[in-house]
Structures are given as structure tokens and as C-alpha cells.
Amino acid sequence: GGRKLKKFLAFFLVLLVGVYFGVGWFAYGQAASVPCDVWYEEANNTPSNWSLGTKADWDPSDYFISSYEEVTILADDGEIELNSWWVENDLSQPTIILLHGVTSSKFSPDILLPMGMFNKSGFNVLAIDFRDHGESTCEDGFYTAGQDETDDVVAAISWLKDKGVKSSNIGLYGSSLGGLVALMTPAKSDDFGSIAVIDPPVDFKTLVREEMAYQGLPTFLWEPIYHYAGTVSYTHLTLPTIPTV
């Protein structure tokens, strides 16, 4: 009787763990997946001609950029191709790397507007699509709360330095997830001079809970998401990766 009870308890424990991680896998897939594409309403945007869409109703044409270059930046030893837009004015002037939000891309007016503003100020500008976003390599269709995306920024910094841009003249500008990535980048590189962020999430647990509530999922699923991400996907959602300044 005792041996049967132990076998039953062991089986039940394995089943319980399997269900727990299965729930985590499903919820993680819902909360962290990204489309690996450009949003259809922004697909025709370019630095030389773009629309604000439903964000505003004024004419942004003063911030159009007539001359720009489409470039590919390699990350992860060439395994990741980052589709980017490069505008060179004067390499002795500041150069800004623009970082978009989650599920967004460089095609968004949230990137194109500041890109045009920086250009009008005589800055050089580089707008990248993170991996699994826009026209960059679709690695697995998930974002990693900045842990892999920071590698994309490091690759962009290296690309600029290869062009002769001084580290002290490189600035990071990020909004939403891009802001979080900018704040995390110093953990991997200090080859830049400044950071400006708009609305960055710094409490990822709260962010995931809010995203789950928005998608109609119960927020208590955060726990299996957290453990699935860390154990199976090696994405540690609450690591203190934003360095203290």
C-alpha cells in the first residue's frame, strides 16, 4: 500500500508540474509574442513620406527626410539581421539611435517624428528594427524584455563606431520597450554618451500583469509565466538588469 501511494504521489507531482509549465507556456505565448512584421497601417511609411495615422491630425511634412539609406546591421555573429534606416549629416555631430516599442517598428510615427526632428537639428540618425520586429530577422516571435534586444543596440553602436562615430557622440533615444532597452544597454556596453527615454516600463512584473489583464487573461498566471520563461526559455523577467547609476 505504501509503495503504491508513493508512486501515485510521484505521478501526481509530475503531472502537476507538467500542467503548471503547460499553463506557463500558453500564457507566455500569449503575453510575449510579437508579429515579426510591420503593422499594416504603417507599412508604407518611410522617412521621406509618412503619416501620423490616427495619432494626430496635423501635417508632419516639415519632418520628412528626403535622403536616407536602408542598411542592414548584423547582430549575434551575423545570425540576426537588423533592418535599419541611416541618415548621415555630419559625423562630427551627435548621432542618435532610435529604439521603438514592443510590436512596433521604425515605420511608426513614434520613431519617424523624432527622427525628423533630430535630422532638422543636424544630427545623424539611425533607426533600427529590433529582432522579431519590423523587417529584421524573425528569431522566434517573442520579445525578451530587453535581454536580447540590448544585443541589437550593441550591434548598432558597433556599426556606428566602424563608420568613425565617436562613442561620446552616440545617444540612445527609446520609447516604451525601446526606453527599457536603452536603460538596460549600459549593462552590456558603455560605448555611448547619453540616453533619453519616454515612458519606459521598469517594473516588468506589473507590465506583464497589465498586458495579461488587457488580453483577458487572469493575472495570477504571472507565476507560471515567470517560471516557464526562466526555466525553459532562459528569459529572466525580473533580473535587476537596469544598472544603478
Label for each model-derived stretch:
Residues 4-53:
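N-terminal membrane-anchoring alpha-helices
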Residues 53-89:
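N-terminal cap/lid segment of alpha/beta-hydrolase-fold proteins
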Residues 93-101:
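Short beta-strand element of the alpha/beta-hydrolase
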Residues 119-137:
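Conserved alpha/beta-hydrolase
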Residues 184-233:
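Hydrolase active-site cap/lid region
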Residues 235-241:
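Conserved small/polar residues in nucleotide/adenosyl-binding loops
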